[in-house]
UniProtKB/Swiss-Prot annotation:
Keywords: Plasmid
NCBIfam families: transpos_IS5_1
Protein name according to UniProt: Uncharacterized protein ORF8 in nfe locus
Domain of life the protein comes from: Bacteria
InterPro entries per the UniProt record, alphabetical: Transpos_IS5-like, Transposase_InsH_N
Pfam families tied to this protein: DUF772
Classification of source organism: Bacteria, Pseudomonadati, Pseudomonadota, Alphaproteobacteria, Hyphomicrobiales
Organism: Rhizobium meliloti
Amino acid sequence: MRPSRPSSGKNDLFRDRLDAIINPRQALVRLAGVIPWARFDEAFGGFYRPVGRPANATRLMVGLHYLKHVHDLSDEEVVERWVENPYWQFFCGFEFFQHEAPIDASTMTPWRKRIGPQGLEELLKASVEAALQTGTARPESLERVNVDTTVQPKAIAHPTDSRLYLKALQMLVRHAKKHGIELRQSYTRLAKRAAVRARRYAHARQF
C-alpha cells in the first residue's frame, strides 16, 4: 500500500516541538527546506501495491538513507542515532521529538530492493541538485567522478588467508634454495595439509 505520512502531532500538546529546539540555520535544517520531498512520493508511487498495510513514509525512508550514506552507518546504527538527534528527526519530516525508533532497521533493505536502481538514481539526482542549490557542491566538482573499485566483485578463491600463507611459505622456500640457504625443515607438507583443512572448515562454515 502507498506510504503513510508522519503524524502531525496535533494531540502531542505536552511534547517538544522540533522547530522550537533546533537551530534553523543548521545545515541539515536548511537542506530539508530545499529537497523536493513530494518528488519522491511521485517517483516511488508506482512501486507500491494498491492494497495491504501502509508503507513507511517516503520522506522518512529517503531521509534515513541519506543520513546513512553521509555518515557511513549501517541500517541499525542510523536508526539508533536517529532517536537521539532532533535534527535528523526534523530532516525526516517529524514535528515532535520522538523517543522511539520510527521503524525496524530490517525494513530498510526491502525498501531499497523495492525502489531498485531507478529509485536510487532518483535519490542521487535529487541530492546533487540540492547540494548545488545550497552551495554545498560546485558544478566543477561534478565534472570528474572518482571510482573506488575496492568493493568490485572479483573471482577470489576462498579462504584467501590460508592460501596466501601457503603461497608465501612456498615462495620463501624457493628463494632459500635459490640462494643456497639450508633449512632444517621447510614445513611445506605441513602447510599444504593445514591449507586443505582450512578449506574444508570454510566449506563447512565451521569458523
